[in-house]
Curated annotation (Swiss-Prot):
Sequence motif Nuclear export signal, location on chain: 69-77
The protein's name: Protein E7
Matches recorded under InterPro entries: Papilloma_E7
Keyword Transit peptide among UniProt keywords: no
Compartments where located: Host cytoplasm; Host nucleus
Function per UniProt: Plays a role in viral genome replication by driving entry of quiescent cells into the cell cycle. Stimulation of progression from G1 to S phase allows the virus to efficiently use the cellular DNA replicating machinery to achieve viral genome replication. E7 protein has both transforming and trans-activating activities. Induces the disassembly of the E2F1 transcription factor from RB1, with subsequent transcriptional activation of E2F1-regulated S-phase genes. Interferes with host histone deacetylation mediated by HDAC1 and HDAC2, leading to transcription activation.
Gene Ontology CC terms, in alphabetical order: host cell cytoplasm; host cell nucleus
SUPFAM superfamilies hit by this protein: E7 C-terminal domain-like
unnamed zinc finger span: 51-87
Coiled coil spans: none
Keyword terms of this UniProt record: Activator, DNA-binding, Early protein, G1/S host cell cycle checkpoint dysregulation by virus, Host cytoplasm, Host nucleus, Host-virus interaction, Inhibition of host innate immune response by virus, Inhibition of host interferon signaling pathway by virus, Interferon antiviral system evasion, Metal-binding, Modulation of host cell cycle by virus, Oncogene, Transcription, Transcription regulation, Viral immunoevasion, Zinc, Zinc-finger
Entry remark concerning the domains of this protein: The E7 terminal domain is an intrinsically disordered domain, whose flexibility and conformational transitions confer target adaptability to the oncoprotein. It allows adaptation to a variety of protein targets and exposes the PEST degradation sequence that regulates its turnover in the cell.
Amino acid sequence: MIGKEATIPEIVLELQELVQPTADLHCYEELSEEETEEERPHIPYKIVAPCCFCGSKLRLIVVATPIGIRSQEELLLGEVQLVCPNCRGKLRHD
């Protein structure tokens, strides 16, 4: 510091010395192939659900992970409804 008051560049310099660590914080650990996360298997599922208009049975065959099929179930029991081909013609598309 030159003079009685510190200037902005001098303050920034002092802060950088406090903030920048001297230790190496990078992780150089490598995972073996056994430790890597295995892909979850895609399993075929048959979904039977009613048409939201006429109630006729709709059958879908999907391939999903166990987590994926649970998500699909939550959607079909909640905010997503299926429509049969006959009722689809009655719908107005935008």
